[in-house]
């Protein structure tokens, strides 16, 4: 049976860096760094989704980023603040802050400059199908684990178990990989992850409902944890 583990972060990053098309590289780079769903990145909605009232494109324009300075105690660091409109939450805005220094995150400056090139236009002016195609080409041969679960048929009250298995590595797997990295490498708590990745607080293990009043807190809460030299 296949090893039910995610690919190494370094393996995935190398694949992204060597993507053949520039827009593919930066699209996948943003999806990974932002812990984003595909619809939070892409700027166009396909005809099927429109007709069936499905996923709405919420992708950014080149104006959806700015630079700020983070200061606390002896720590002073420049950050690029990216605006992400959260899918499944009516486009609720969340801010993704990434260190500008390459020793903390070598992709931040590249992505920031790519945004600026697009001005008022959409940064990724294509549909999620194209994003999936880019992921399919870029991550060919990679897979990620799906834990066992139960399927429910409205015509059959008895749940049908589905065994743990592997799926081809695509855009949604980037979200899983980044979330795992934020927890295991950077020490994010469930609350930090809900603020960063746009999950509802009640969906995060270990985050009580009483914490919901603080969900508006911005990037300054989690940003110091990203100031960890890795590269």
What are these regions (language model features)?
Residues 62-126:
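Basic, alpha-helical nucleic-acid-contacting "clamp/cap" segments
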Residues 6-38, 42:
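Basic, Lys/Arg- and aromatic-enriched nucleic-acid-binding interface segment
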Residues 29, 33, 173-200:
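C-terminal catalytic core of tyrosine-transesterase DNA break-rejoin enzymes
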Residues 9, 99-165:
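Active-site/catalytic core of tyrosine-dependent DNA strand-transfer enzymes
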Residues 19-20, 30, 163, 167, ...:
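Residue-level marker of regulatory loop/turn positions in helix-turn-helix DNA-binding domains and
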Residues 31-77, 190-195:
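Short, charged phosphate-coordinating catalytic segments
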Residues 9, 23-25, 132, 172-176:
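Short, leucine-enriched amphipathic alpha-helices that occur as contiguous helical runs
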């Amino acid at each position: 049976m296949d090893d039910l583990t995610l690919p190494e972060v370094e393996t995935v990053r190398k694949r992204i860096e060597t993507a053949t098309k520039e827009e593919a590289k930066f699209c996948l780079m943003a999806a990974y760094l932002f812990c984003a769903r595909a619809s939070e990145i892409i700027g166009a909605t396909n005809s099927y989704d429109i007709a069936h009232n499905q996923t709405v494109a919420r992708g950014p324009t080149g104006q959806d980023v700015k630079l700020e300075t983070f200061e606390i105690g002896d720590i002073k660091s420049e950050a690029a603040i990216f605006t992400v409109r959260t899918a499944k939450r009516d486009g609720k805005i969340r801010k993704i802050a990434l260190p500008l220094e390459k020793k903390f995150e070598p992709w931040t400056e590249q992505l920031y400059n790519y945004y600026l090139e697009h001005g008022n236009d959409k940064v990724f002016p294509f549909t999620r199908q194209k994003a999936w195609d880019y992921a399919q080409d870029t991550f060919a041969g990679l897979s990620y684990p799906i834990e066992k679960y139960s399927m429910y048929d409205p015509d059959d009250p008895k749940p049908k178990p589905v065994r743990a298995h592997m799926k081809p590595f695509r855009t949604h797997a980037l979200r899983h990989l980044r979330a795992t990295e934020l927890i295991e490498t950077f020490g994010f708590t469930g609350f930090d992850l809900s603020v960063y990745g746009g999950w509802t607080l009640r969906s995060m293990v270990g985050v009580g409902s009483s914490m919901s009043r603080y969900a508006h807190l911005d990037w300054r809460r989690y940003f110091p944890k990203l100031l960890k030299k890795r590269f």
